[in-house]
Structures are given as C-alpha cells and as structure tokens.
C-alpha cells in the first residue's frame, strides 16, 4: 500500500471542484482499495500521542468564518478500534485510545471526501504530539511501517508551505512568494534524493524554511509519510501548485 502526504490547503476545497480536488479523486480511483486509513492531520496537534478508537467518529468542523455549506458537510466513515489497537501495539502501548473526544477533522475529511467519496473505508486519526521535536515524529512513524503490508493506507495531511500571515485570502491565483517557491523546490529536491536529514532539521534550512513553516503543525505530517519510504521505492508528486501565494498544495506519494 502506498503512503501519501496531501497538501490539503483551504477547507473550501472540500466543496470545490478544481485541479487539486480532481487530482485527489484520481488518486482514489487508481490506488489499491485500503482495508482502513490512518491519517495524521495537522489539525490534531496536542500534547500527547492519541488515536481515535471509536466505532463512529464524528465529523469535526474545526474552523470559522466559512459558508454554511461547508459546515453541513459530513464524512460518515466508520472508525476502526482494531486499527487503533494495532497502532497502539506498534507504538509500544503508550498511546491514548480516544473513545469520544476527537473524530475526523477537516485535515482528514476535506481530502477524503474527494479521494473516497463513499466514506465506506474505516478511518483512524493519529495525533501529532506538539511537545516533541521533528525527529521524534520521524522515528515514531517508522514504527508504523508494518501497516503498509497489512493493507492500511497511511496519510499525512498538512502543507509543506503554510503561512497564513501572508496568505492572499480570496486570491487563489495569487503568485507564490519567492521564498515559498524556493522552499517548495528545496523540499522536492531533498525528497527525491532520499535526503531526509535536512527535512527533519528543516528549521536549519534558513529564512525560506522559517517563513514557509512558521509553526510545525502543517509541516510535520510530511515526515510521517517520508519515514515510511523503503530503499529504492519510487516517490512522485501527484499534486502540485500554490494557493493564495503562501500555501503549497504539493502532495507526495511513496510507493
């Protein structure tokens, strides 16, 4: 099973038809059907490692200021307590099994509503531990590698470049900032060269990196996918582009 990082961008993509969402739908049509999905979303960024372990995760509308139509979207995919337990096992038994607090946030459902619109594949979310450094997340993700051979699609959902302070709201065709394009290109180069060290220590890559990822939450899901890459395995970029000048919509497929 491949592992895929999705640049999810603006929540409005959930109810939009554009080049990004059409590419997401094409991914869903062409990859093997997974038994279940494990998603690491930028929007479950908390002080601890947890997994959703309920039978029926709720759809979380974790945003404000958007049209009512977006708040009416539901993604009623089942959960998978079995997958939650398997993740807990792989991670050493110290994971919080969340039975009722979280659910599926828009980092997950705004993409999956296009990739698997029937919402008939079980979905589990894994939180991002906000108190740990990037290396922790990369190392933790490596322990999830057996899932790929068990028919589980591992997804990271965030954005390699994500700076809302400079985002041109309502100007989806805005030219990307030079620093955003440079960091996006640098990340691609490092990914293609299997040079994950600088991507883990991304803050040391200079001003472009600090502007592109001013907070870690949207960047870290990328590391969960890169950590699952095997030697000599193909990496592709099925979705490319920028939104609002400072959000990279780049997606990364491993395998």
Feature-to-residue mapping (PLM):
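Long, well-ordered alpha-helical scaffolding segments within enzyme catalytic domains
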Residues: 23-30, 136-150
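Short, basic/glycine-rich phosphate-binding loops at helix/coil junctions
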Residues: 4-5, 62-67, 116-124, 200
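A residue-level signal for conserved active-site and pocket-lining positions in enzyme catalytic cores
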Residues: 40, 87, 126, 158, ...
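Short, well-ordered beta-to-alpha junction loops that form the rim of enzyme active sites
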Residues: 41-43, 102, 157-160
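Internal, conserved structured core segments that host functional sites
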Residues: 83-138, 143
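A short aromatic-anchored loop/beta-hairpin motif
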Residues: 1-94, 99
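Conserved beta-strand scaffold positions in the cores of enzyme catalytic domains, especially
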Residues: 3, 37, 123-125, 154
């Amino acid at each position: 099973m491949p592992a895929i990082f999705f640049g999810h961008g603006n929540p409005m993509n959930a109810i939009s038809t554009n080049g990004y969402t059409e590419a997401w739908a094409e991914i869903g049509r062409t990859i093997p059907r997974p038994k279940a999905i494990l998603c690491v979303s930028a929007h479950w960024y908390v002080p601890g490692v947890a997994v959703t372990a309920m039978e029926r995760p709720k759809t979380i509308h974790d945003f404000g200021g958007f049209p009512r139509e977006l708040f009416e979207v539901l993604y009623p995919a089942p959960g998978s307590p079995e997958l939650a337990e398997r993740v807990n096992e792989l991670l050493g038994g110290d994971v919080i099994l969340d039975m009722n607090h979280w659910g599926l946030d828009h980092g997950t459902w705004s993409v999956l509503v296009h990739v698997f619109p029937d919402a008939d594949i079980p979905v589990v979310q894994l939180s991002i531990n906000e108190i740990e450094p990037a290396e922790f997340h990369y190392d933790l993700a490596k322990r999830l590698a057996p899932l790929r051979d068990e028919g589980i699609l591992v997804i990271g959902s965030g954005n390699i470049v994500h700076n809302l302070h400079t985002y041109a709201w309502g100007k989806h065709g805005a030219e990307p900032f030079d620093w955003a394009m440079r960091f996006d290109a640098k990340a691609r180069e490092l990914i293609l060269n299997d040079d994950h060290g600088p991507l883990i220590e991304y803050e040391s890559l200079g001003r472009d990196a600090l502007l592109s990822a001013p907070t870690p939450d949207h960047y870290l899901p990328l590391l969960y996918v890169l950590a699952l890459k095997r030697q000599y395995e193909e990496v592709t970029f099925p979705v490319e582009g920028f939104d609002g000048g400072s959000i990279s919509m780049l997606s990364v497929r491993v395998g």
